[in-house]
From Swiss-Prot:
Superkingdom of origin organism: Eukaryota
Residue ranges of every copy of the PITH domain listed in the record: 115-285
Tissues in which the protein is found: Ubiquitous.
Protein name: Thioredoxin-like protein 1
Residues covered by the Thioredoxin domain: 2-109
Cell compartment(s), UniProt: Cytoplasm; Nucleus
Main location: cytoplasm
Gene Ontology CC annotation, any one: proteasome complex
Swiss-Prot/TrEMBL keywords: Cytoplasm, Disulfide bond, Electron transport, Nucleus, Phosphoprotein, Proteasome, Redox-active center, Transport
Length: 289
């Protein structure tokens, strides 16, 4: 939907989020008479037309007091970001440039822009929950680094000295993992034998990865690493995951180096919201914000 859609009452809020599906939903919490809210309104409206792949909603904290309380709104304007009805981020204040940067950040490599029909109902692409600053990759080449495999484009991650890679992926809140996508080329350089570890207390090296018992070991086929491939995980073992360490031991064709075109995880957040990011301070009617 192009344009900002006002949410008229509390019962309307969840249906609007449901309608957004896996697309990014940007919700502006505003209040009548709030100067900063009025100042950023034209820019917010402009962004809704500039980024039609996202859904833009506006909630008045007095008209929808229950929604404001549930989402712990303590000041206006506050912008909350949702995907699959799950809150994934927030932005506070009337800085239009900062808000647009946040929107672009979430739309970059947007898993919601192309609906993944192979993702089971009730699960979602967890790319928005990956904390890129907390990720690490050992034995990546200088020319083809780790960031490349987090994007759906022609770039790729390639190993450097040999065929092995050791990747640590951090999440910004605990998640449950159902499966993963692990895409590679069909020239023999795609990954084959892979060990998956979760929630390691510290980084491991290649020697430790070789000798340690994984949470799950994978033997990927050429079909698994195609674009439409899904690699199932043992769901009961991946119920409260803060980080994943992926040890790629070998590739499909015993090639000198390994390439990964793209990977992501499918699952759900443990909680619908990351409450550590928010203080429960709800303004009363008539208070200044």
């Amino acid at each position: 939907m192009v344009g900002v859609k006002p949410v008229g009452s509390d019962p309307d809020f969840q249906p609007e989020l449901s309608g957004a599906g896996s697309r990014l939903a940007v919700v502006k919490f505003t209040m009548r008479g709030c100067g900063p809210c009025l100042r950023i309104a034209p820019a917010f409206s402009s962004m809704s037309n500039k980024y039609p792949q996202a859904v833009f909603l506006e909630v008045d904290v007095h008209q929808c007091q229950g929604t404001a309380a549930t989402n712990n709104i303590s000041a206006t304007p506050t912008f909350l970001f949702f995907r699959n009805k799950v809150r994934i981020d927030q932005y506070q204040g009337a800085d239009a440039v900062g808000l647009e940067e946040k929107i672009k950040q979430h739309l970059e490599n947007d898993p919601g822009s192309n609906e993944d029909t192979d993702i089971p109902k009730g699960y979602m692409d967890l790319m928005p929950f990956i904390n890129k600053a907390g990720c690490e990759c050992l034995n990546e080449s200088d020319e083809h680094g780790f960031d490349n495999c987090l994007r759906k484009d022609t770039t790729f991650l390639e190993s450097d000295c040999d065929e092995q890679l050791l990747i640590t992926v951090a999440f910004n809140q605990p998640v449950k993992l159902y499966s993963m996508k692990f895409q590679g080329p069909d020239n023999g350089q795609g990954p084959k034998y892979v060990k998956i570890f979760i929630n390691l207390p510290r980084s491991m090296d290649f020697e430790e990865a070789e000798r340690s018992e994984p949470t799950q070991a994978l033997e990927l086929t050429e079909d698994d690493i195609k674009e439409d491939g899904i690699v199932p995980l043992r769901y009961v073992k991946f119920q409260n995951v803060n980080s994943v360490t992926i040890f790629v031991q070998s590739n499909q064709g015993e090639e000198e180096t390994t390439r990964i075109s793209y990977f992501t995880f499918i699952g759900t957040p443990v909680q619908a919201t990351n409450m550590n990011d928010f203080k429960r301070v709800v303004g009363k009617k008539g208070e200044s914000h």
